[in-house]
Amino acid sequence: MLKQRTIKSIVKTVGIGLHSGRKVELTLRPAAPGTGIVFSRVDLPTPVDIPASAMSIGDTRLASVLQKDGARVSTVEHLMSACAGLGIDNLYVDVTAEEIPIMDGSAASFVFLIQSAGIEEQNAPKRFIKVTKPVEIRDGDKFARLEPYFGFKLKFTIDFRHPAVDKTGQELEVDFANTSYVREIARARTFGFAHEVEMMRELGLARGGSMDNAIVLDEYRILNNDGLRYDDEFVKHKMLDAIGDLYVVGHPLLASYTAYKSGHGLNNALLRELLAHEDAYEIVTFDDPQAAPKGFAFDAQTAFA
């Protein structure tokens, strides 16, 4: 059977919160089959466990924020994206602040951390959410849609009227049957505009943001001396975010995702719309790994790698 996966050993790292600018300690621990991805605020007087779920996402203005009993964990999307890309089903994430550290602004550090811990298959069937009917959410001209597909593919279009972004391509389509998440998506960094960063800092946000963890643009160009990691890094990062946003549904999706100018809020609304229609999805497993869609029947060390 196609099995669930966790990590083999405990791994730790330290980084800074994008908005607080404060040091954050992050510990990843193995979890039993059926646990899911569980975030734990171990810095609180009584630690609070917050399982990743579509219904636990609260604030989505600047990141995807999990909330429970007054506790929050912000900016979970890059770590969730890495878990999706490596096929991790079960994991405890201990964090000492209300933000996951931003690291280099991509998912690459989390991919490295998980691969360093080692990936272990567990004796339980991997569960998928198979989309059986189209589901769509719109907000003005923005939209996000899930449609039936035997695999996982995404098409994302952005629309930033900026000369540097225009040059790199504003649309990307990826099918993980033939694309490596680790090589083609994981290293894409978050990006922002210099004038917006200044405004955010005045509001007490983005205190940890720098060219070490983001692509920064002025009105005309990219300010980072090292340039871009991918020719189309901007739209690839939006896809990286979407993969993480969608993975909070609790299981990998078997679906085709199409989006135009979508963000954390619209992605979460799409998951809630899906879950509200019980006839739009079903939970499936694969007794024969070879019967699973290409890209999911991976060996124990790589998923979309």
From Swiss-Prot:
GO terms for biological process: lipid A biosynthetic process. Its EC number is 3.5.1.108. It catalyses: a UDP-3-O-[(3R)-3-hydroxyacyl]-N-acetyl-alpha-D-glucosamine + H2O = a UDP-3-O-[(3R)-3-hydroxyacyl]-alpha-D-glucosamine + acetate. Keywords: Hydrolase, Lipid A biosynthesis, Lipid biosynthesis, Lipid metabolism, Metal-binding, Zinc. It is an enzyme of class 3 (hydrolase). It holds the Pfam family LpxC. The keyword Lipid metabolism applies. Zn(2+) binds at H78, H237, D241. SUPFAM superfamilies: Ribosomal protein S5 domain 2-like. GO terms for cellular component: membrane. The active site is at H264. Pathway: Glycolipid biosynthesis; lipid IV(A) biosynthesis; lipid IV(A) from (3R)-3-hydroxytetradecanoyl-[acyl-carrier-protein] and UDP-N-acetyl-alpha-D-glucosamine: step 2/6. Belongs to the LpxC family. Catalyzes the hydrolysis of UDP-3-O-myristoyl-N-acetylglucosamine to form UDP-3-O-myristoylglucosamine and acetate, the committed step in lipid A biosynthesis. This is UDP-3-O-acyl-N-acetylglucosamine deacetylase. It comes from Burkholderia ambifaria (strain ATCC BAA-244 / DSM 16087 / CCUG 44356 / LMG 19182 / AMMD) (Burkholderia cepacia (strain AMMD)). The lineage of its organism: Bacteria, Pseudomonadati, Pseudomonadota, Betaproteobacteria, Burkholderiales.
